[in-house]
Regions:
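Short, charged helix-capping/linker segments at alpha-helix termini
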Residues: 12-21, 31-50, 177
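Residue-level preference for hydrophobic side chains embedded in well-ordered alpha helices
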Residues: 22, 26, 30, 51, ...
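Short helix-capping/turn signature of helix-turn-helix
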Residues: 25-28, 36-37, 137-144
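Hydrophobic-face residues of short alpha-helical interaction/recognition segments
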Residues: 30, 34, 59, 72, ...
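Hydrophobic positions on the alpha-helical face of helix-turn-helix-like DNA-binding modules
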Residues: 51, 75, 136, 149-150, ...
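Sigma70-family region 2
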Residues: 12-13, 39, 50-67, 86-88
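DNA-recognition helix of helix-turn-helix
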Residues: 81, 124, 132, 141, ...
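Internal acidic/polar
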Residues: 1, 82, 90-118, 145
Length: 177
C-alpha cells in the first residue's frame, strides 16, 4: 500500500488513479462532514463532488503544512457551507405532499435502534447554530484540531473552544430529553 506522499506526488503529475486511491482513504469522513453540514443527502453528494473536483484542480496548492486528509476535509467543509449558503438564497419549492417514501425492510431491532439514534442526533444537531455545529463536526467527525478549525472559520482559538463546548453541552441536553 502506497503512502499519501507517494500518491500525492503521482496525482500532482496527473495520475488519476493515484488521486482516486488517495481521496478514497478520506472520502467516508468527508462525506460525513458534508452530510452533517448540509443535513441533506443530495446536497451532501453535490458538496462532496465539488470538493473532489476542487481538490483535483488545486493539488498544486497543497503545501503540506497539514495532512492531506485535513486539507481535503477542509475543502469538503467549505463546499458544504457554500452549498448551504446558496440554498438559503434560493426560493424553496413546495414538495409534493404525496412524496416518495423509502421503505426499509425490518431486518433487526438493532438496525432500527441505530436509525432512531441517528435521527435523534440529526434533529439535535439541527438545533445548534451553524458555526457551532460546523466546529463540532470538524472536530469530532473530521478530526481537525481546534487551531485548524479556527483558521477554517476565521475565528480565534478561544471562540472555537467555546463553540465546541457549547455545542457539546447543548447536544447532550437535547439528547437527554
Amino acid at each position: 500500500m502506497k503512502d499519501d506522499a507517494e500518491l500525492l506526488s503521482k496525482a500532482r503529475e496527473g495520475d488519476e488513479r493515484a488521486f482516486a486511491e488517495l481521496v478514497t482513504r478520506y472520502q467516508h469522513i468527508a462525506w460525513s462532514v458534508c452530510m452533517r453540514i448540509t443535513e441533506n443527502q443530495h446536497d451532501a453528494e453535490d458538496a462532496l463532488q465539488h470538493a473532489l473536483a476542487s481538490t483535483w484542480k488545486n493539488l498544486s496548492r497543497f503545501r503540506g503544512e497539514s495532512k492531506f486528509g485535513t486539507w481535503f476535509y477542509r475543502i469538503a467543509s467549505n463546499a458544504a457551507v457554500a452549498l448551504v449558503r446558496k440554498r438559503k438564497q434560493e426560493k424553496p419549492i413546495d414538495d409534493d405532499e404525496d412524496g416518495y417514501f423509502i421503505q426499509l425492510e425490518d431486518t433487526a431491532a438493532a438496525f432500527e435502534e441505530q436509525l432512531a439514534d441517528h435521527d435523534r442526533l440529526s434533529i439535535a444537531l439541527q438545533q445548534i447554530n451553524a458555526d457551532s455545529r460546523e466546529a463540532l463536526v470538524l472536530a469530532e467527525v473530521a478530526g481537525l484540531t481546534y487551531a485548524e478549525i479556527a483558521v477554517h472559520q476565521n475565528a480565534s482559538l478561544s471562540a472555537v473552544k467555546v463553540r465546541i463546548h457549547r455545542a457539546k453541552k447543548k447536544l447532550a441536553d437535547l439528547l437527554e430529553k
